[in-house]
From Swiss-Prot:
The keyword Ribosomal protein does not apply. Its EC number is 3.1.3.77. Pathway: Amino-acid biosynthesis; L-methionine biosynthesis via salvage pathway; L-methionine from S-methyl-5-thio-alpha-D-ribose 1-phosphate: step 3/6; Amino-acid biosynthesis; L-methionine biosynthesis via salvage pathway; L-methionine from S-methyl-5-thio-alpha-D-ribose 1-phosphate: step 4/6. This is Enolase-phosphatase E1. Monomer. InterPro entries: Enolase-ppase_E1, HAD-like_sf, HAD-SF_hydro_IA, HAD_sf. GO terms for molecular function: 2,3-diketo-5-methylthiopentyl-1-phosphate enolase activity; 2-hydroxy-3-keto-5-methylthiopentenyl-1-phosphate phosphatase activity; acireductone synthase activity; magnesium ion binding. The gene is mtnC. It catalyses: 5-methylsulfanyl-2,3-dioxopentyl phosphate + H2O = 1,2-dihydroxy-5-(methylsulfanyl)pent-1-en-3-one + phosphate. GO terms for biological process: L-methionine salvage from methylthioadenosine. Keywords: Amino-acid biosynthesis, Hydrolase, Magnesium, Metal-binding, Methionine biosynthesis. NCBIfam families: enolase-ppase.
Length: 232
């Protein structure tokens, strides 16, 4: 019996374009000014970590901004970039400049699954702060109260490694066989299954990642009949 459902975001609950155009675009436009404004407080560890990772110990804030923008454009999963993006976008969510965008079937499905007793969690490459803001500031009504746990690359590990899913199961205190993972990435589904989870692929029109065997694939959360099975 499935007791917990773990959700990917990009391509699964939300359009990839919305995540990258909204969050990435907002971050890219504000990086230089934000780094300069917060160089002595919130940005200080980000500046230091970026200089170390890039091998540029003497880089000024403008050069660090260029490095972070290059990483953003290449979708590099670097911790200082994720931290900067989380802090910058948090300001955007707080002011109403940003909202979480979801496929139309997602909010009602999440509410139904939650009402039926399923525990809902998120596992994404986005920072924990961005994840929470994305759901809390969902367009059309907040969804954050439905989510009981968030995991990212720092707290769980790489999404294509089985060990990451074992760590999530341990953190949740749930047996692997009671966990269901929903993602649009076949390699991530492979890793979840290798860790003993159930996994279902989500392939939506216009999304870039193709489905492949041996996984079951759906085009909408409506195709999962989990809400009819209350969890004891």
């Amino acid at each position: 019996m499935t007791t917990a459902i773990v959700l990917d975001i990009e391509g699964t609950t939300s359009p990839t374009g919305a995540v990258r155009e909204d969050l990435y675009g907002y971050t890219r436009a504000r990086l230089p000014e934000w780094l300069a404004r917060h160089r002595d407080d919130a940005a200080a560890p980000i500046l230091a970590a970026t200089r170390e990772l890039a091998g540029r110990p003497d880089a000024d804030t403008d050069e660090v901004a260029r490095i972070l923008r290059e990483w953003l454009g290449s979708d590099v999963k670097a911790e200082p970039l994720k931290e900067a993006q989380g802090l910058i976008c948090h300001e955007g969510f707080a002011t109403g400049a940003l909202h979480g965008e979801f496929f139309p079937d997602v909010p009602p499905a999440l509410r139904a699954w939650h009402a039926a007793g399923h525990r809902l969690c998120v596992y994404s490459s986005g920072s924990l702060r961005n994840q929470r803001d994305w759901f809390a500031h969902a367009r059309g009504g907040e969804l954050g109260s439905l989510i009981s746990a968030h995991f990212d690359l720092t707290t769980a590990g790489p999404k294509r490694e089985a060990g990451s899913y074992r760590r999530i199961a341990e953190a949740l205190g749930v047996e692997a066989g009671q966990l269901l993972f929903l993602s649009d990435h076949a390699d991530e589904l492979d890793a979840a299954v290798a860790a003993g989870w159930s996994a279902v692929g989500v392939h939506r029109p216009g999304e870039p990642n193709p489905p492949r065997p041996p996984h079951r694939w759906i085009g909408s959360f409506d195709e999962l009949d989990l809400a009819r099975t209350p969890v004891s």
